Design a protein with these regions (language model features):
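Cross-kingdom leucine-rich repeat
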Residues: 1-251
Length: 251
């Protein structure tokens, strides 16, 4: 298995100061890379710089087809995992696991054009990313709406994401035929999963703890997320009322 555990494996002298881990001239050389574990690069802004990839008109870009795992930890300046590339791009078709932890400048994970490449993605974990508002952003005008996304995803963990509002704000009819585990832990602004009907035939509940002890289910994923959100709001209101009563008693 070919792994990259530290960016110094790419002949980078000071990994804490790099801004783009895989610029265009390097990406094409990493055909056998299977696993990436990246941690504590304080100035890194982009993982995969696809924006400046140049190919002949007759060619189709194919990048990192063997990559199976991508683990990103404590990258405070990271703004893009994938920065947009040519429409004809192919790649990342074997990625199974995506872990993102402590990336406080990220506002989203995927664009639709990238998500459609991730046909084998099985597990998504997003933890302690303060600015993330959506996992999948809306399609740009030049992008086609994609409905057949995330068919292999069987596990999603969303944890300690204070600004997360939804998985996606696009009213697509998403289907999740493989989704079995869904964990939502301390995401106080998550009011819905997607603004449309969705099918999750294998999902039986949404867990609110990492040990899989407590789950909720209200018939579908959107209704369950909404129920959890309302429950959190109700608990906060009760706590505020209790504090006010204690204050008035003291006065």
């Amino acid at each position: 298995m070919t792994k990259l555990k530290d960016p110094r494996a790419s002949d980078i002298d000071n990994p804490s100061k790099i801004q783009s881990l895989f610029p265009p001239h390097i990406i094409g050389r990493l055909k056998n890379l299977e696993s990436i574990v990246l941690q504590d690069c304080q100035l890194l802004e982009v993982i995969f710089q696809l924006e400046e990839l140049n190919f002949e008109e007759s060619q189709v870009a194919s990048v990192l087809d063997q990559l199976r795992e991508l683990n990103l930890y404590n990258l405070p300046k990271l703004m893009h995992i994938w920065k947009k590339g040519p429409e004809r791009i192919r790649g990342f078709g074997n990625l199974r696991l995506l872990v993102v932890w402590g990336c406080n400048s990220l506002t989203y994970l995927f664009s639709p054009s990238i998500a459609k490449l991730l046909v084998m993605l099985e597990e998504i974990q997003v933890t302690k990313c303060k600015k993330i508002e959506e996992i999948l952003i809306r399609a740009r005008e030049e992008e086609k709406e994609e409905k057949n996304l995330f068919h292999k995803v069987n596990s999603i963990l969303l944890r300690d994401l204070p600004n997360l509002k939804c998985f996606c704000n696009e009213a697509n009819a998403f289907e999740w035929p493989s989704l079995k585990k869904m964990m939502v832990i301390r995401c106080p602004n998550l009011r819905m999963f997607v603004p449309s009907n969705l099918k999750t035939p294998e999902l039986e509940g949404v867990y609110e703890d990492i040990e899989f002890k407590t789950s909720q289910w209200k018939g579908d994923l959107n209704a369950t997320i909404e129920h959890i959100f309302k429950g959190k709001v109700w608990h906060i209101l009760i706590a505020i009322i209790s504090l006010m009563e204690e204050f008035n008693t003291c006065v």
